[in-house]
Every structure is written in C-alpha cells, then in structure tokens.
C-alpha cells in the first residue's frame, strides 16, 4: 500500500464517528395529501360496497311476472326509482325464483334465509307500479290468493351529498397549494415573510480570504479592523470603543465589492448572510418589512456574523423621489424597517452589516448617517500595480507559455476592472484550447483583450469596397487628429476588421490614469472623436451613419462642460448636476429657466462647431498623411504603433505609444533612420472610443 493510500485511510478513520458512519436522514416519501386521499378512497369504498347486503338483482319485466304468479310477498318502493322486495318462502323453497348463492364471509357473516329471499330491481319512470299492485291485490282477493304488501319511502343519500360539497372544495384547495409551490418554493403562505438570504459557511471548501482578493490594498486595510473586531470583540469594547454598525462598499461594477465582503467573512471565520436588495420586495404588501425583521432575527441567533446586502440601492433610494410618477410605498416601508433595525442594533452582538452599491448618490441620507452606514469604502478600478496582482491571481491555475509577461498585460489593460481581467484570462485559455496548444501564450492574451474590448472578430462578414473605404478614412481621421493633439491618449492600434454586433472598425488608445481633466483636454478629446466624421466629409463630400457613437459622445461631453463643470463663459460658473443631485426630478423640474436652457443649447452647438472646424484644419494640413494611412489600412486592415510612427512621423506631444514602455526607444530610432528589429509592435490596449457602428441612428 502506498503512502498516499495510507494517509487517505487514516484521514477517513479520523473523520468516522465512534458510533459508526452516520446515514443520511431519510424524509418521508409520501406527503400528508397522499395519506388523506387513500383514507377518503377507503371510506368511499366502504360506504358504497360494504354497507350493502347481498341481494339478487332481477329485471323489471321479470319482477312484474313474479308478481302475477304470486311469488312476491312484499315490495318497497324507494324514491320512486328503486324497488326492493322479498320472495315468498314457497317460491324460494321450490326453486321457482333465482336467488344468489355465496360462501360464508368473515366480515359480513353467514347468508341467512331472510337474505336469500330479498331482491332488487329498477323501476322505469313511466310505469305506475302502485296502480299495478292495487289491481293485482284486488284480483288476488277475489281469487282467494295472498296479496302483495307494498310501501314507499324517500331515502336521503347523505354521504353522496357530502361528497358533492366536500370534493370540489378539496380539489380547489389542492390546486391552490400546487400553484403556490410551482410559482416558488418560498411562496407558501407560511413562508412568505421569510427572508431569502443565503448563508455561506466561511470555513467551508470555498472559503475566500484576502489572498484571493488582489489589489484593493487601501480597502483591505479598512476592513481589516472589522475582521479584528469579529475575531476579538473584547479588544475594542474593553476601552469603550464601538465598531461602525454599517460598512458601505462603493465602486463601479466588477471591481470586487462582493468578493471583498466574502473575504471579510472568510478571514473572520463567521457565518455570512448574503442577500440582494431586490429580494426584500415582493408583490404582497408588508413582505419586505417582514423579511428584514426575519433576517436580523437570524443574524442575532448566529452572531457573530456578517449581513451583506448587494445592490442596496434597490431598497435604499431616497424617499420622496419620483412623486410625479407615483411613489413606491412598499419599497419605502422596507427601507423604514431596515433603518429601524440598524438603529437599534447592538454592536456588542458581533454582527456587522455590509452593503454594496455603485449608486451612492441615490441612497437615502438617513441610511448614510452616523450609526447606520457610517463608513464608506471606495472600491475603485485598479491601477497598473494592482492589475498585475489581479493577473497573478487569475493566471495561477493556467498553464502559461514562456513568452507571457504579466507586466505587459497590466500595461495593456488600463481601466479594466477585476471582473474584466478575469474574463480576459478565461478567454485566453479558451482560445488556446481551441487552437490545441499546450500552454496559453501571449498571442492568446492579446486576442482575448481585443475580444473583450471590441467583441468577436467577424472574418467572414462581407463588406462592399465602398463601405470598407469609408471605414478606413473614418478610422484614419480619428488616428491623425488624436496623434497631433496635446491632451489626447496615444493611439496604439487602428483596425477596419469588423467586430462585435455592428462594429465595422475601431481605434484603440492607451489612456493615462488621470483623475482631473482641464477644459483644453476635454476639447482635444472631442476634436479627436469628431475627426472620423470630418474625414468622411472632407474626402467623400458626404457623411454616413457610422459616426453615431461619436456624435453621442461629443454631445454628452459638451453638455457636461456647460451644465456640470461650469466651463462656459456665457452660462457662467454654475453646476446644475442634472445626473446626480436631482435624480428623477430633473426631468420635470429643471433648476433653470427656459432662457438659460436656450443659452445652454447654443453653447453646446458652439463648442461642437468649434471642435469640428479644428478637426477640419488638422486634416486639411495632414491630407497626405490621411491618404497614406487610409491606403495602409485598406492594405493591412490592422495597424500597430510601428506602422503609425512610419506613416505619421514623431508624435509632437507626449511619449510614443507603448503599452509596456520597452519599445519607446526603438520607435524613436525609427524616426532617425536607424535600423530596428523586424518585429512589429502591435500590442492592443483598451479603447476610449467605442467601435464605429454600422447601424443607422
């Protein structure tokens, strides 16, 4: 036996309880409804078959014949439809009538002579049996023969009537219960107020710790205090300190807010309740508040623990919003109950409330006040160093080739969130497996980045030569205008290969990680965005629908400059912030007059016209470079930094486009006429511009 087998047996022996292995609990396979149905079936069978007696059934015509012959002694008419009678002893004894013969029954006993003489028949509705018997008795008296005694009675079938009323009721109740169970397992009447929180075992097989959360160093430092509190609460309460009752994780989608909350539970080793904000609200009134109470009740029972509410803006929006459209009373009641539960929560219990949202501006102020969610932790998109750590986490289970450089990949993916980086790694592994490779190479990662940014490459999409030429000049216009402006991002790739749902071409840039933009920087970006449309107009004398996304972007930026950032001299240093502070009411109650609105529209048009003329001047001056770049695009379809430097010359502002900083000197030497290596630098990078769309606006 090998050492591994001995270790496995020893581990199994340790995990086996002293009283032997525990068998899984078996639940009853039959529900109470099945037992009830069986009982009712037996009851019906008993009343219908066992309560009756064994009597012979004869035809009505034969019954009339027996009466005429004097074989019948007594007749009883039941409900004017059924006839029960008794033969004479002489007729039975002499065998003049047919009677049933059966063996002795243990349940009903022996067959007596009285039972043998009985018979039953069915009376037709159109026959007057009473008149027939009266006429027979008169003839029998006249002839001196025995007469037939007859009576009539009304028999009520109480059991049949009971079934007529109860059976439909039982059927309706069973159908109602069945429909409730089909709609949702938790939609039963008794469980409608139960919360839908999922309890994760922090010490289970899928435990998440801070090692699984790459980057986010500042955020992990903030939540480390929470972990320490859950491990050793007396350390804080001994000196009279209190931990914040609520921690709100704020950040863009995909940055790791939920993952960080799971890591907190994994590090502290406590139960972790996870629930979405939309799970509280139901179609029934009062269910949301009941689920909040039930959630906090369970949390108190399992303290110390963590309650994590994902997308809390679903129930935490400011009260009073949307009055013009009608307020949601159920959502507000749920929020009120949440506020009450959090305000009365005792931090000594060891229960921490965490929530995540990417819309903190719409949350109710009462939810953010001290004593509730009084600590906000920003989970922002990672920088280059943090992206490198994220790549290390997501590639540790991949078989990487020798040419894979994670530092280069981190430089090629500025603006990527953690979820997008994970998607890039997974796409690269799938591409390598599709090609039958033994390891994931750098080429696979570059193609995966292109795929995540611009979508799937459509090699077989048929485009007419005219449209292909328009797309080439459009993308060349973007690249040239951006190349010769000071505050634009370096162009690293231009392509006219169709990608995605409707993209006919795209340009990729290497954006700098900046947080402030000047007025000049915004104008340069708008000029670059409109360069494609201006190039079409300059070369072909007409425009196409491919610039729809460009026009949307520059219009949005122009309105932001005038309305939000106060960058218009005519409007002044004001900020109306329509997308943030005023929320839904901004569409109905704008904080400025009609005259100001007209002035804003005029300023937006003026700014767009200025950047358009600026782009036209640049393209007219660089017309030869525009033609050369478009011809090279039509020839190669994809151009990298080396091709751009060869055609456009040195970039007048900023560094040469290089995602990793290793090819800057090589590209500079290219402009001086010095020999360089034959390998082209075509490293893709995330675009600041969405691919051009072929759809009409």
Swiss-Prot record:
Any one annotated GO CC term: plasma membrane
Segments of this protein annotated with the region Disordered: 1-23, 649-697
Residues on Periplasmic side: 51-158
Cofactor(s) the protein needs: Zn(2+)
Superkingdom as given in the UniProt entry: Bacteria
Any GO BP: proteolysis
Binding site for ATP: 251-258
Predominant location: membrane
Enzyme class: hydrolase
Parts of the chain that traverse the membrane: 30-50, 159-179
Keyword terms: ATP-binding, Cell inner membrane, Cell membrane, Hydrolase, Membrane, Metal-binding, Metalloprotease, Nucleotide-binding, Protease, Transmembrane, Transmembrane helix, Zinc
UniProt xrefs under SUPFAM superfamilies: FtsH protease domain-like (SSF140990), P-loop containing nucleoside triphosphate hydrolases (SSF52540)
Topology versus the membrane: Multi-pass membrane protein
Subcellular location: Cell inner membrane
SMART domains: AAA
Residue ranges, compositional bias (Basic and acidic residues): 662-672
Record has Plastid as a keyword: no
HAMAP family assigned to the protein according to its UniProt record, in alphabetical order: FtsH
Subunit structure: Homohexamer.
Function of the protein: Acts as a processive, ATP-dependent zinc metallopeptidase for both cytoplasmic and membrane proteins. Plays a role in the quality control of integral membrane proteins.
Family, similarity comment: In the central section; belongs to the AAA ATPase family. In the C-terminal section; belongs to the peptidase M41 family.
This protein's name: ATP-dependent zinc metalloprotease FtsH
Gene: ftsH
């Amino acid at each position: 036996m090998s050492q591994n087998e001995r270790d496995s047996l020893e581990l199994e022996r340790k995990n086996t309880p002293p009283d032997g292995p525990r068998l899984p609990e078996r639940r009853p396979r039959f529900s109470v409804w099945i037992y009830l149905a069986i009982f009712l079936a037996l009851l019906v069978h008993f009343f219908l078959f066992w309560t009756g007696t064994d009597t012979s059934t004869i035809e009505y015509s034969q019954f009339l014949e027996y009466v005429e012959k004097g074989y019948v002694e007594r007749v009883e008419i039941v409900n004017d439809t059924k006839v029960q009678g008794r033969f004479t002893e002489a007729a039975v004894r002499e065998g003049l009538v047919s009677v049933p013969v059966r063996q002795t029954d243990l349940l009903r006993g022996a067959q007596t002579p009285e039972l043998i003489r009985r018979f039953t028949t069915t009376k037709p509705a159109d026959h007057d049996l009473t008149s027939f018997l009266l006429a027979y008795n008169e003839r029998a008296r006249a002839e001196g023969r025995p007469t037939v005694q007859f009576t009539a009675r009304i028999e009520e079938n109480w059991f049949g009537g009971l079934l007529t009323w109860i059976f439909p009721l039982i059927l309706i109740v069973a159908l109602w219960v069945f429909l409730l169970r089909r709609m949702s397992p938790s939609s039963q009447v008794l469980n409608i107020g139960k919360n839908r929180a999922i309890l994760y075992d922090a010490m289970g097989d899928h435990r998440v710790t801070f090692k699984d959360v790459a980057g986010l160093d500042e955020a992990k430092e903030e939540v480390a205090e929470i972990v320490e509190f859950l491990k050793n609460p007396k350390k804080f309460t001994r000196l009279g300190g209190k931990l914040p009752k609520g921690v709100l994780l704020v950040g863009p989608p995909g940055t790791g807010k939920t993952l960080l909350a799971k890591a907190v539970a994994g590090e502290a080793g406590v139960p972790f309740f996870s629930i979405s904000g939309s799970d509280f609200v139901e179609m029934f009134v009062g269910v949301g508040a009941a689920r909040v109470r039930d959630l906090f009740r369970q949390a108190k029972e399992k303290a110390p623990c963590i309650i994590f509410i994902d997308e809390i803006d679903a129930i935490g929006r400011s009260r009073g919003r949307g009055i013009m459209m009608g307020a949601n009373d159920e959502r507000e009641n749920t929020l009120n109950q949440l506020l009450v539960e959090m305000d009365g929560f005792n931090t000594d219990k060891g229960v921490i409330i965490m929530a995540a949202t990417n819309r903190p501006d719409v949350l109710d102020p009462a939810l953010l006040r001290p004593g509730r969610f009084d600590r906000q932790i920003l989970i922002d998109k990672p920088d280059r160093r943090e992206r490198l750590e994220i790549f290390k986490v997501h590639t540790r289970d991949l078989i990487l080739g020798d040419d894979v450089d994670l530092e280069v990949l981190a430089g090629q993916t500025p603006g990527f969130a953690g979820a997008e980086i994970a998607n890039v790694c997974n796409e690269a592994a799938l591409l390598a497996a599709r090609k039958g490779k033994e390891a994931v190479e750098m080429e696979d990662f570059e193609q995966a980045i292109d795929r995540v940014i611009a979508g799937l490459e459509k090699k077989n999409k048929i485009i007419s030569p005219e449209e292909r030429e328009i797309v080439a000049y459009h993308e060349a216009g973007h690249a040239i205008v951006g190349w010769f402006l000071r505050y634009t991002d370096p162009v690293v790739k231009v392509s006219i290969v169709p990608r995605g749902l409707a993209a006919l071409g795209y340009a990729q840039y290497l954006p700098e990680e900046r947080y402030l933009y000047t007025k000049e920087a915004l104008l340069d970006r708008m000029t670059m965005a409109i360069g494609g449309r201006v190039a079409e107009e300059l070369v072909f004398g007409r425009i196409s629908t491919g610039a729809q996304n460009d026009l949307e972007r520059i219009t949005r930026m122009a309105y932001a400059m005038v309305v939000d950032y106060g960058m218009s001299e005519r409007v002044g240093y004001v900020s109306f912030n329509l997308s943030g502070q005023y929320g839904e009411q901004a569409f109905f109650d704008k904080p400025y007059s009609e005259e100001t609105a007209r002035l804003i529209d005029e300023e937006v048009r003026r700014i767009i016209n200025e950047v358009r003329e600026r782009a036209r001047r640049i393209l007219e001056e660089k017309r030869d470079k525009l033609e050369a770049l478009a011809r090279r695009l039509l020839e190669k379809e994809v151009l990298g930094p080396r091709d751009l430097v060869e055609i456009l010359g040195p970039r007048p502002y900023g560094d040469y486009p290089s995602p990793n900083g290793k090819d800057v000197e090589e590209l500079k030497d290219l402009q001086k006429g010095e020999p360089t290596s034959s390998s082209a630098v075509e490293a893709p990078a995330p675009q600041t511009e969405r691919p051009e769309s072929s759809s009409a606006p």
